[in-house]
Amino acid sequence: MSAVSRRNVLRGGLVATTAGVVAPGTVAEAVAAADGASCPAPPGPAMVGHGDRRYRSLASRGYNRRVVGEPEHVWVVGTTAHVVRAAQQAVDSGGRITVRSGGHGFENFVADPAVEVVVDMSAMTGVSYDPARRAFAVEAGALLGDVYRRLYLGWGVTIPAGWCADVGVGGHILGGGYGPLSRLMGLSVDHLYAVEVVVVDRRGRARAVVATREPSDPHRDLWWAHTGGGPGTFGIVTRYWFRTPADGDDPSGLLPAPPAGVLSFQVSWDWEKLDRTSFARLVRNHGAWAEQHSAPDSPYLALYSELALTRRPSGTVFMIGQVAADSGAERMLDEHIAALNRGVPVQPVRPVRNQAWLAAALAGSPGDPGPVYRLKVKSGYLRRRFTDRQIEALHHHLTRTDYDHPGGGVSLYTHGGKVNTVAPDATATPHREASIKMF
């Protein structure tokens, strides 16, 4: 797994690291021909430079306003053939190239001063069923909300992916794809059948390759690399195909069906009433619950929560989440809160709301202010709960008085369940024993 780098931004062009990529032939022309034959002309290709009125909108489209890049130009693309052209131009000119889908990357991998060319995927948003592959094709510029809506309204299915509806599919899937349904259904990449990716071979030729999970596919290692290897690492993804391993030709049976409804909740504890002891007990209880219910046979897989340990000046420690409404949701939530609050002398406030699943999926995480953040983050996975010493360090930094800004904190997401049924080497996402995801 160490060969897969999540931080490897391609320098001077896209170089494929997989031997199977250099086989002759290309699918770019076929894809372009199919697009042109069945659809209106797509936008692009357009190479937008500093003198173009669109430049500022495209260059500053990132979620994290702490980092804003100034590339020489941004390519607006509408087809795989356009992406091939953009990649070839970057290789020929020697310019450093990267790619942006939804713009939710927290680091400066796109907004790096060294980046000269950005390929903007936001016009490639198609979602359709591909009968030839018995899989759902999703273009890399589609937002999660669009994917949820089209898959659910069209076929009654979904992929288990993130909670923020305006996250782009392109980078999200390449990080594994985790969200509120993952404990029930696994990661997005556990349902990834194929990927179309523009690479550059050893002769400096940009071209599109389709790699599948089929054992006989000579490009299978390229598929594997895209099941958690990180965005922009091996090429520019233009399209994904999703299908849960299943037989039959009925699209409604080829991906999981989400619950009809969910119980959404937001629970809060008043910081003024939490002392060092009660804070430690709350965090310890949460860790114990997450460990106990991370196994694939837990009766609580339908429950997903995020405990946000915010700084004391913010006023509250809070927990958000949802429970599949067809699983005894009220009882399950009551038991979850009771377990976390055991021995904590503070009664939490707990507003809840019953919602149709699609409405909840499109609404996203409660309180998300949208693309207005300026932040630095780090994430990780925990097999076991925090130690008492670690909890003490958390409390110290969340309550210290020499820094009075309310921003900052640690969020703990329940993990495991179906995610942990997959072998660590089956995909490029090796974290298959975790009980908590930390952010």
Regions found by a protein language model. Name each.
Residues 134-138, 142-152, 168-169, 353-357:
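Short, structural beta-strand-to-alpha-helix junction motif
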Residues 161, 166-270:
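FAD-binding subdomain of flavoenzyme oxidoreductases
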Residues 19-37:
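C-terminal region of N-terminal signal peptides and the immediate post-cleavage residues
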Residues 36-63, 102, 107-110, 252-439:
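Cofactor-binding catalytic cores of oxidoreductases
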